[in-house]
Amino acid sequence: MQWLFNLRFSDYYFGFAFLYPLFMAWLWIAGGIWFYLKREYRENDVPQPSEHACSILIPCFNEEDQVRETIKYAMQTQYPDFEVIAINDGSSDKTAEILDELQQTYSRLRVVHLAENQGKAYALKAGAMVSQHEYLICIDGDALLHPHAVLWMMHHLTRFPRVGAVTGNPRIINRSSILGKIQVGEFSSIIGLIKRSQRTYGRIFTVSGVLVGFRKTALDRIGYWRDDMITEDIDVSWRLQFDHWDLHYVPNALGYIYMPETFIGLWKQRLRWAQGGIEVLLAYTKQMFNWRLRRMWPVAIESMISILWAY
């Protein structure tokens, strides 16, 4: 063991830089395999719809190019009882006019107009306040729902009374560029693997804000989304789990999304994600010392070490 004490700081530094990703990769693989064998393997058949209704919330800000497709796919949901609420978050383009037009076409569609842009968190809360049902399915204004996505998410929300939120499995549509194809591999394998392993080991770092289902009772207990946080999806995930609600990852609940295909766009997106994660860690570090929240410790420790490794 003497050699261990003879190492220089640079040796420890480079050892950590190279060995930490390798260690986490094996940890994720082991957790992902366990999740598949324990849960995913037995969930092949599309579940039967429950007797509960749901509200699909779609916050929209300057989505004139995509909102028609988004609403169209939402309306093709293979679930018997649902409503769609589109929230126009003070758009400056033709989003408002398009939504009003679509409301005349689809009887299930309701439109809420906000006078000015308030942000996604505020728009979601506005939609939740006017929704008629206990279960909320939230997607982005440019996301496309798979016809069975709501079935899978409602299956978990209604079957498990302690589940406060379920996160779906986003798939990337735009694959024309090399950057887009790389992100396809990232979302199809790495991100899904991490969520599977986190669910296996205890808690999930964050739901996918682009495709997520909530129990309104759970949201009401924690005060819904905070509009002062950079990434409201990470924040609401942590607060739900602080309130002892479970979060489920549902790989069969598919949604199709558009991702940045330029390095600048990708950099801005990932920078926002990183800032949001750090913001949540700083905001809730003191609460993490509570023994009742010990199941959140692995997620918090992993996040802290990952931030340290990144720097």
Each PLM stretch: what is its role?
Residues H52-S55, E83, D235:
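Cell-envelope/extracellular polymer assembly enzymes that use nucleotide-activated donors
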Residues R68-E69, D93-L102, H148:
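Acidic helix N-cap motif at the loop->helix transition within catalytic regions
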Residues M1-S50:
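N-terminal membrane-anchoring/stem segments of glycan-assembly enzymes
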Residues F23, R110-H113, A121-A123, G127-M129, ...:
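Long helical/loop segments within the catalytic core of UDP-sugar-dependent glycosyltransferases
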Residues K72-D81:
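Short, acidic, metal-binding catalytic loop of nucleotide-sugar glycosyltransferases
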Residues S237-G255:
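Catalytic donor-sugar/metal-binding loop of nucleotide-sugar-dependent glycosyltransferases
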Residues D81-G90, R110-L114:
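Short beta-strand/loop segment that forms part of the nucleotide-sugar
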